[in-house]
Swiss-Prot record:
Protein topology in the membrane: Peripheral membrane protein
Disrupted gene: phenotype observed: Abnormal reticulophagy.
Physiological role: Involved in endosome-to-Golgi retrograde transport as part of the VPS34 PI3-kinase complex II. This complex is required for the endosome-to-Golgi retrieval of PEP1 and KEX2, and the recruitment of VPS5 and VPS7, two components of the retromer complex, to endosomal membranes (probably through generating a specific pool of phosphatidylinositol 3-phosphate allowing the recruitment of the retromer complex proteins to the endosome). Mediates the interaction between VPS30 and the VPS34-VPS15 core complex, leading to the recruitment of VPS30 to the membrane.
Keywords assigned by UniProt, alphabetized: Coiled coil, Endosome, Golgi apparatus, Membrane, Protein transport, Transport
Subcellular location(s) of the protein: Golgi apparatus, trans-Golgi network membrane; Endosome membrane
Transmembrane domains' residue ranges: none
BP terms from Gene Ontology: cellular response to potassium ion starvation; late endosome to vacuole transport; macroautophagy; phosphatidylinositol phosphate biosynthetic process; protein transport; SNARE complex assembly
Identification of the protein by name: Vacuolar protein sorting-associated protein 38
Higher taxonomy: Eukaryota, Fungi, Dikarya, Ascomycota, Saccharomycotina
Family: Belongs to the VPS38 family.
GO CC, any one term: Golgi membrane
Length: 439
């Protein structure tokens, strides 16, 4: 019994047949068609996905009556409604020598693609091969589980019967249509099952939305905490700059009030006072820089404490190694940033959907930590711009630093570039920390 399909897909394909196989077009050279058109042509077909992925290559067959049936088609598992079908035939060397300018260079038969079809399985016309005649050249007929189909553009003609069928009078008996109780019972069960499925889908959707909102709120809390720390750091740095500017203005005013003597003794004393002032200003600058360094180390230590709630500093799965320092001044020497390994990340993300979401969130936290530490705290430029968007962060506005459920080749190439650029930023910042010289 044929099944009714809402949508025909690759997995419903059972057999492929080609009608009117020919090496020549219908409007080709009539002389060649007459001479070589009636021979047996060895053929096979190639089945590909719409993305160019190879699905199946058939065996070579030579059919009779210009018709080939490939019945040993394996069971496909694809869910796509589009396929690419190619028919490949063996062209004899005699034909190649006839149409080629190089007569001596062709000695063997050649395999050539006779036709290529991009087929939408839901846009085919149903046919019955026993009652219609297909007139097109190399016309495919696809046998699916719900019937036989050919291309919508193919021309078909109904076959005329050799013997006219016997005509008889139509019975006048009225048929009364009825519906059995068992059919109604089955329909009721189907409706109950459908309603249960819809209820379960709604419950699962609501749970997913609740989990997503809770995770989103948690990320917002981290962002607010980090933003408050950044604002506090900027205010303290601004106050330090103002105090430094006031010291400079006071020194300039004190220098303007010095009485210039015309004697050599007064000039010597003036030089000595200038040297003393220079020494005092330099020492104050050193003190201010030392306070600024202390402030940076303190903010870095606070930032590390904030990110300790994530797994960035986990000894097994984390990306940052940090050993508790003996003093705040030693915090940058205890901080070690690890570069990303694309092979390890691909293996972890491919285990399950939960592992992929975990890896994406950790990559987002790592990017945010590097951005805040380098740009906000140490004011150090990085070669590539880091943009934090949670578990879908990007680099330079175009390279995604996250994994998807379907890793197409284009996304994977951009992801590899993003990891390369991110490792370059890590290397740049590690060199800055190694060359950083606090007072």
């Amino acid at each position: 019994m044929k099944r009714f399909l809402l949508s025909r897909r690759q997995r419903h394909l059972r057999m492929i047949c080609f009608h009117n196989i020919s090496l020549f077009r219908a409007n080709g050279d009539s002389k060649l068609i007459k001479e070589y058109g009636d021979g047996f042509i060895p053929c096979f077909f190639i089945l590909e996905s719409i993305r160019g992925e190879l699905l199946y290559v058939s065996e070579v067959q030579s059919g009779s009556l210009r018709k080939l049936s490939f019945q040993e088609l394996p069971k496909l598992t694809g869910a796509s409604t589009m396929i690419v079908l190619k028919l490949v035939g063996l062209v004899p060397s005699d034909i190649l020598c006839t149409i080629s300018s190089d007569k001596n260079g062709i000695i063997d038969d050649k395999w050539c693609v006779l036709c290529t079809y991009t087929i939408d399985l839901n846009k085919l016309q149903p046919i019955n091969e026993d009652t219609v005649l297909i007139t097109g050249t190399n016309a495919p007929v696809l046998d699916l589980i719900d019937g036989s189909y050919t291309l919508a553009a193919e021309k078909i003609k109904p076959l005329k019967g050799l013997v006219s069928s016997h005509k008889r009078n139509i019975s006048q008996v009225k048929i009364k249509f009825s519906l059995a109780y068992s059919s109604l019972l089955k329909l009721n069960k189907l409706l109950e099952y459908s309603s249960q499925v819809h209820e379960e889908i709604n419950e699962i959707s609501s749970k997913i939305e609740d989990d997503f909102l809770s995770l989103k709120n948690q990320n917002h809390w981290y962002m607010r905490t980090v933003q408050k720390s950044i604002e506090t750091l900027e205010k303290e740095v601004l106050q330090r700059k103002k105090s430094k500017k006031n010291i400079e203005m006071a020194q300039l005013e004190s220098n303007d009030t010095i009485n210039h003597s015309k004697t050599e003794l007064s000039l010597m004393s003036q030089d000595e006072s200038i040297n003393d002032d220079y020494g005092s200003i330099y020492s104050r600058f050193v003190q201010i820089k030392d306070r600024l360094d202390q402030l940076r180390f303190k903010k870095l230590y606070q930032l590390i404490g904030i990110f300790h709630s994530t797994d960035l500093f986990n000894s097994d799965r984390g990306y940052i190694y940090f050993e508790k320092p003996s003093s705040v001044n030693d915090v940058i020497n205890r901080l070690k940033l690890k570069p990303l390994n694309i092979e390890i990340l691909l293996r972890q993300a491919g285990e399950s959907t939960k592992h992929r979401e975990y890896v994406n969130s950790q990559l987002g936290y790592y990017l945010l930590f590097l951005h805040l530490t380098a740009i906000q705290i140490f004011k150090a430029p990085l070669p590539y711009r880091l943009m934090y968007y949670g578990s879908t962060s990007v680099i330079d506005s175009q390279y995604p630093l996250y994994f998807t459920d379907q890793m197409i080749s284009k996304h994977q190439a951009k992801l590899i570039k993003a990891i390369h650029y991110f490792n370059a930023d890590i290397l740049q910042f590690k060199q800055i920390l190694e060359n950083y010289r606090p007072t």
